[in-house]
Amino acid sequence: MKRKIIVACGGAVATSTMAAEEIKELCQSHNIPVELIQCRVNEIETYMDGVHLICTTARVDRSFGDIPLVHGMPFVSGVGIEALQNKILTILQG
């Protein structure tokens, strides 16, 4: 089953693209089929139907119901990337 993931940032361009590429490669290397949706943080609710994970590169001080939310800045900075990858895999494989 395809896992639907929202990747969001302030402008839906630079940092979300970096995070989306990292997530895509991570999932491909673990044979997890994904559908990635890039958007602005303020557009997340528009795309939430059937979503398994939300990854934001901007700070978000709220929750989205039962959908897990991870902070994707390690994909941009490189700091803490392995821990984030493990967290994402745990969520998607669980």
From Swiss-Prot:
Subcellular location as annotated: Cytoplasm
Domain PTS EIIB type-2 intervals: 1-94
Coiled-coil residue spans: none
Species per Swiss-Prot/TrEMBL record: Escherichia coli O6:H1 (strain CFT073 / ATCC 700928 / UPEC)
Name of the protein in its database record: PTS system galactitol-specific EIIB component
Catalysed reaction equations from the record: galactitol(out) + N(pros)-phospho-L-histidyl-[protein] = galactitol 1-phosphate(in) + L-histidyl-[protein]
Induction / repression: Constitutively expressed.
Taxonomic lineage from the root: Bacteria, Pseudomonadati, Pseudomonadota, Gammaproteobacteria, Enterobacterales
Chief location bin: cytoplasm
Name of the gene: gatB
